[in-house]
UniProtKB/Swiss-Prot annotation:
This is ATP synthase epsilon chain. The keyword Repressor does not apply. Produces ATP from ADP in the presence of a proton gradient across the membrane. Its main location: membrane. GO terms for molecular function: ATP binding; proton-transporting ATP synthase activity, rotational mechanism. Residues 93-104 have a biased composition (Basic and acidic residues). It is found in: Cell inner membrane. SUPFAM superfamilies: Epsilon subunit of F1F0-ATP synthase C-terminal domain, Epsilon subunit of F1F0-ATP synthase N-terminal domain. It is a peripheral membrane protein. Residues 93-113 are annotated as: Disordered. The gene is atpC. Keywords: ATP synthesis, Cell inner membrane, Cell membrane, CF(1), Hydrogen ion transport, Ion transport, Membrane, Transport. GO terms for cellular component: plasma membrane; proton-transporting ATP synthase complex. Belongs to the ATPase epsilon chain family.
Length: 145
């Protein structure tokens, strides 16, 4: 029997930024963690900034996504994002600095509501980059991280 793979496409405003096949795609949607395999029921979900793991056989591509929307059909996963980076291209020091800057901005007592929302978004994105880096190294992260 021939093994069936999901088609996976990650699309940004620049076009397709990742194409591949997968046994399983793991990501966090609006309802929580999801593992999507061939034959999955159709769904549409929002995605927070986070990690997408695309596993085919023994290889896993670890991707950072800035947030977006995932569309699932029984044979395909399409993820629409503003930004995507492969974990191996992320810089740990830069992500840690971005996280520290965002945390500092959140402590500013004179910050406007808009500034606080922007800093919160930057903090979520920096945390997601760090999670992607850790995931690519085989390090565990939890929902609380």
């Amino acid at each position: 029997m021939t093994k069936k793979y999901l088609k996976v496409d990650v699309v940004s405003p620049l076009g397709s930024v990742f194409k591949g096949e997968a046994d399983i795609v793991s990501l966090r949607g609006s309802a929580g963690e999801m593992g999507i395999a061939y034959g999955h029921t159709e769904l549409l979900s929002t995605l927070p900034a986070g990690v997408v793991n695309v596993r085919k056989d023994e290889h896993t591509d670890v991707l950072y996504v800035s947030g977006g929307i995932v569309e699932v059909t029984p044979t395909r996963v399409t993820i629409m994002v503003d930004d995507m980076e492969r974990a191996e291209n992320l810089n740990q020091a830069e992500a840690e600095k971005a996280r520290a800057r965002a945390q500092e901005a959140l402590k500013n007592p004179d910050a406007s509501k808009l500034d606080i929302e922007a800093a919160s978004k930057r903090l979520s994105e920096a945390d997601a980059r760090l999670k992607a880096l850790n995931s690519s190294k085989g390090l565990y992260y939890s929902k609380e991280d």
